Amino acid sequence: MSLHLHDTATRTMREFHPRLAGVASIYVCGATVQGVPHIGHVRGGLNYDVLRRWLVHNGYDVRLVRNVTDIDDKILTKAADAGRPWWEWATAHERAFESAFDRLGCLPPSALPRATGHITQMIELMQRLIDKGHAYAAGGDVYFSVASYAEHYGRLSGQRLDEVQQGESTASGKRDPRDFTLWKAAKPGEPSWPTPWGDGRPGWHLECSAMSTYYLGSEFDIHGGGLDLVFPHHENELAQSTAAGDGFARYWMHNAWVTMSGEKMSKSLGNTVAIPAILQRAAAPEIRYYLVAPHYRSTIEYSEPALAEAISAYRRIDSFVNRVRQRTGEVGHGTVPAEFAAAMDDDLSTPQAIAVVHNAIRESNAALDRGDDRAANEAAASVRTMTDILGLDPLSEQWADTRGADDAAHHALSELVGSMLQQRQQARAERDFATADAVRDRLQACGIAVEDTPDGPLWTLKDG
């Protein structure tokens, strides 16, 4: 089976055929760097990182571009409220976002363009649209004329043209309330850049069209982003890009939200879980597991029990790989089972793929119990390869390179506890239950609870 992806534009599963053989080009809408990143922000970046890893595993040369929106109304407002320059505020939070992606194991993007670094490309795109009759200037603003492209507008989102309303009233200079802003005229005290139509700053939609085609060409393979971006952002991107003559994206992918109490996680609602805060409660790979284990098009309803379940599941993988390494020596990389490949080719069905991982662990633990170290090592090597595709390989250098002080402490603890549990398992195998119980009691005295499961012993830190 070859890779099939759910395409938002056609609302169907489509077989992936890249524009250029052996090359995959991906543009992902990144963050508006207005504040501290939360788990809802980073979910999409992790999902598209898994897509990238799967494509690389299958031999593709992948070029992934993720933008940074570093000029926006919210950035200006928050910077002013904090008494800081807007650019300083944006830069600080851009670093926070990149640190979050790095700590959660995202491969660095091929390019990480900032909106403010591509004003020239935006001006060129606006000029093309004006020349073709699809945009117009009014009072220093520049607008896209939806009526001029009515036959094609709405094909991504399914939005009816007679229901479209794009915010500002016609009093702002718009000819039609459906038209959307490409360029905003300068206001006193705000940053601005010169254009043939007056000083100002870019509109949100214009930025992504200019940057994606600049780095990936006028037509590229996959455009990704959150479900909330389908309309108006991606609809407007598609309209302005194709109206200008670009082929633009061949496939559209959208990841679902992280919610809390049924509502999308959002700073405006005050229901977010910040990355720095959650990293105090769980190790980085455990958080990544929590966010990539569900299907990317399925909503994640955040709860502490669900997070705890994900932590336990990842620790089973971590404990297993380290148990095999301690027992059999170095664990390399192995083959990918057909069931895992089939799951990943089916629109990145990570729940099924992870089920294959846990099945392999159960079989390998059985091999260890019967003394078949060779089979156990081969299975562990396969588990390493599967988890590496998901960005979850417990032995990956990415965790050593990105681990902060808290993660380093957890890793050291994991190694020590794993060694003690191996001693306990050996004692139980030799029916030396007194020694096994003594090891368990020592761990419990240190605040570590041990649970014997079909996948092997699982340890957790006790509350309090």
Swiss-Prot record:
**Location relative to the cell:** Cytoplasm
Question: Which GO molecular function annotations are given, in alphabetical order?
Answer: ATP binding; cysteine-tRNA ligase activity; zinc ion binding
Per the UniProt entry, the Enzyme Commission number(s) are: 6.1.1.16
Q: Could you confirm whether the keyword Phosphoprotein appears in this record?
A: no
Family assignment from sequence similarity: Belongs to the class-I aminoacyl-tRNA synthetase family.
Q: Which PANTHER family match?
A: CYSTEINE--TRNA LIGASE (PTHR10890:SF30), CYSTEINYL-TRNA SYNTHETASE (PTHR10890)
Oligomeric form and interacting partners: Monomer.
Report the protein name in the record. Cysteine--tRNA ligase
Query: From what organism does this protein derive?
Result: Saccharopolyspora erythraea (strain ATCC 11635 / DSM 40517 / JCM 4748 / NBRC 13426 / NCIMB 8594 / NRRL 2338)
Phylogenetic placement of the source organism: Bacteria, Bacillati, Actinomycetota, Actinomycetes, Pseudonocardiales
Which gene name does the record give? Answer: cysS
